[in-house]
Regions:
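Terminal, compositionally biased segments
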Residues: 1-9, 78-86, 93, 149-168
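Inter-helical turn/loop segments and adjacent helix faces that build the functional surface
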Residues: 31-43, 66-67, 122-138
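Preference for long, well-ordered alpha-helical segments
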Residues: 108-168
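Long, hydrophobic, amphipathic alpha-helical segments used as structural scaffolds
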Residues: 33, 60-63, 67, 91, ...
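Alpha-helical bundle segments that constitute or directly flank the non-heme di-iron/ferroxidase center
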Residues: 6-37, 103-126
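Alpha-helical transition-metal enzyme core signature, strongest for iron centers
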Residues: 15-29, 45-59, 80-87, 108-115, ...
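Amphipathic, non-membrane alpha-helical segments in soluble helical-bundle scaffolds
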Residues: 8-19, 42-49, 70-77, 98-112, ...
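Carboxylate-rich helix-loop segments that flank metal/cofactor sites and access channels
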Residues: 66-98
């Protein structure tokens, strides 16, 4: 089932907001991992990017189990917004800057925080729903916590590198 962004119950809107954010987040994570390949950041970002894609697939599975249609328009707009975000000035004319890295890792961290809240909300409202049998919400919550723990040192280091550097 495909929905067109209008109406819907709160659960449908909530899950569609999260799947749209997860789509943008997966794209951002892939880009951050590619931009940092071969650096101290690269392997962690690659692992987190893989997990974010798995988490998005888990969310789509949850939506299907709960008979919630995916709002393709909302998802496409979020994906497009992530792509447009690449056009933001980052302190240097060409290439990848320390500020780009910081902002990407911060955005990933915020996304992981939102995903953690999503899984907790689903556990508290639908944790015993037989339609979600086989979906390990506790595992998804733990994975979000793990992602947060792995991203935080990268975010701190990226902030030190980007914000201590003086341009001009």
């Amino acid at each position: 089932m495909i929905v067109l962004g209008l109406g819907g119950d709160h659960l449908s809107i909530y899950l569609n907001d999260h799947v749209a954010a997860a789509t943008a987040g997966a794209s951002l994570a892939r880009r951050a991992a590619a931009s940092n390949k071969g650096t101290d950041y690269g392997s962690v970002l690659e692992a987190v990017a893989n997990e974010i894609e798995e988490d998005r697939a888990a969310l789509v599975d949850v939506m299907q189990r709960l008979s919630v249609g995916q709002d393709r328009l909302k998802t496409a707009l979020a994906w497009g917004a992530e792509k447009a975000g690449r056009l933001k000035l980052n302190g240097q004319l060409l290439g990848y800057s320390p500020l780009s890295r910081l902002e990407e890792i911060e955005a990933l961290s915020l996304g992981v925080e939102g995903k953690h809240a999503l899984w907790q909300a689903l556990r508290s409202t639908h944790g015993t729903d037989p339609r979600l049998a086989g979906v390990d919400l506790d595992d998804l919550i733990d994975r979000a916590r793990s992602q947060r723990r792995r991203l935080e040192p990268l975010r701190t280091r990226a902030a030190e590198e980007a914000l201590r550097q003086r341009s001009g």
